[in-house]
């Protein structure tokens, strides 16, 4: 399909630079049924919009401070880590990468440095961090939260982002982007969901910086996704299969949860344990096997994520839903409002 079929105009004022407070006060657009009926709600309404026996699936990845600023000699170098490849090695997208040669040492300050070990075909650079201290501790000292370009380009990252850009479920360190749909959840909301008979489960998918990259191809067939590591354990898979067998719905919270669930599910509709990389790319025409609904934020024009929601609900319906959201002043992207997509 042509990538420009997934384009739309978004006014800059619709881009959120800070999250709602409290988190569950964010607005939520309900898109429901084969006709894509729309209703303006709030995230706090979620317990009344789901059914007894449904299950929400959250991504428990934890964002690391993966944005680094350093120098190679006099040249300023910016690096965004996006995938771990060894005990001390991370693949990174590097600003001013042409100034970095294999074997160069980059000083990131605070006693943190790395050697440019190799250059990848995608233009990324493999960084080999020096010293014996765990890389996670080095990043805590020298790194900042890797906010998406559409936020970082409008304001500097600050200490608030260390909390704001982390979900309440964040446990497994390794993501360089937040699973943002889950940013809306609070302990109060989780208690209300449990009281309404709605279950929850977690899986892990370490979101990579590739999620921020634009689609450069003109046709979806020519686009290649970056691989991300994920895991679903046997107990979680068994529980989700039991939920569906009993007539409940599996609702993915975020596109990362959805993509991993679909990667772990066979043609028979059975969710299986998963431990490995996925580069699944979902576009219209895909047959969903694992999920019955999706809660997700509002995505970029011509992005792989807008293609995914178009696959779930239909491109025309999602174009209409986004036009409604823009007209009604919904806040877009990582710190923005939410949508609940129930194809019916």
From Swiss-Prot:
Compartment(s) where it occurs, according to its Swiss-Prot or TrEMBL record: Cytoplasm
Catalytic activity line of the entry? 7-aminomethyl-7-carbaguanosine(34) in tRNA + S-adenosyl-L-methionine = epoxyqueuosine(34) in tRNA + adenine + L-methionine + 2 H(+)
What is the protein name stated in its UniProt record? S-adenosylmethionine:tRNA ribosyltransferase-isomerase
Name where it mostly resides.
cytoplasm
Gene Ontology cellular-component annotations: cytoplasm
Instruction: Give the record's pathway.
Output: tRNA modification; tRNA-queuosine biosynthesis
A Pfam family of this chain: Queuosine_synth
Q: What does this protein do?
A: Transfers and isomerizes the ribose moiety from AdoMet to the 7-aminomethyl group of 7-deazaguanine (preQ1-tRNA) to give epoxyqueuosine (oQ-tRNA).
What EC identifiers does the entry list? Answer: 2.4.99.17
Q: Which family does it belong to?
A: Belongs to the QueA family.
Keywords from UniProt, A to Z, are: Cytoplasm, Queuosine biosynthesis, S-adenosyl-L-methionine, Transferase
Query: What Gene Ontology terms describe what this protein does at the molecular function level?
Result: S-adenosylmethionine:tRNA ribosyltransferase-isomerase activity
- Superkingdom to which the source organism belongs: Bacteria
**GO biological processes:** queuosine biosynthetic process; tRNA wobble guanine modification
């Amino acid at each position: 399909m042509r990538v420009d079929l997934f384009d739309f105009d978004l006014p800059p004022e619709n881009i959120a630079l800070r999250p709602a407070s409290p988190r569950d006060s964010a607005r939520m657009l309900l898109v429901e049924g084969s006709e894509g009926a729309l209703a303006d709600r709030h995230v706090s309404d979620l317990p009344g919009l789901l059914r007894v026996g449904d299950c929400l699936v959250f991504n428990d990845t934890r964002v690391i401070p993966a944005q680094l600023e350093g120098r190679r000699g006099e040249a300023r170098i910016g690096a965004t880590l996006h995938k771990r490849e060894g005990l001390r090695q991370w693949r990174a997208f590097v600003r001013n990468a042409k100034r970095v040669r294999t074997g160069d040492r980059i000083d990131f300050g605070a006693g943190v440095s790395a050697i440019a070990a190799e250059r990848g075909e995608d233009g990324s650079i493999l960084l080999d961090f020096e010293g014996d201290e765990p890389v996670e501790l080095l990043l805590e000292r020298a790194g900042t939260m890797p906010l998406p370009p559409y936020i970082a380009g409008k304001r500097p990252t600050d200490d608030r982002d260390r909390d704001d850009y982390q979900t309440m479920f964040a446990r497994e360190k390794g993501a360089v982007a937040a699973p943002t749909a889950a940013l809306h959840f609070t302990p109060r909301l989780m208690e209300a969901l449990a009281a309404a008979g709605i279950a929850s489960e977690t899986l892990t998918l370490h979101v990579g910086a590739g999620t921020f990259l634009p689609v450069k191809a003109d046709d979806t067939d020519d686009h290649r996704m970056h691989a991300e590591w994920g895991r679903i354990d046997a107990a979680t898979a068994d529980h989700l299969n039991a939920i569906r067998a009993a007539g409940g719905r599996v609702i993915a919270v975020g596109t990362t949860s959805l993509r991993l669930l679909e990667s772990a599910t066979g043609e028979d509709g059975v969710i299986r344990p998963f431990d490995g990389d996925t580069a699944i790319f979902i576009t219209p025409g895909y047959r969903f096997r694992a999920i019955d609904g999706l809660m997700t934020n509002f995505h970029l024009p011509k992005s792989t994520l807008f293609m995914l929601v178009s696959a779930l609900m239909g491109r025309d319906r999602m174009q209409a839903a986004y036009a409604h959201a823009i007209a009604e002043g919904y806040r877009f992207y990582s710190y923005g409002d939410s949508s609940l997509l129930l194809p019916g």
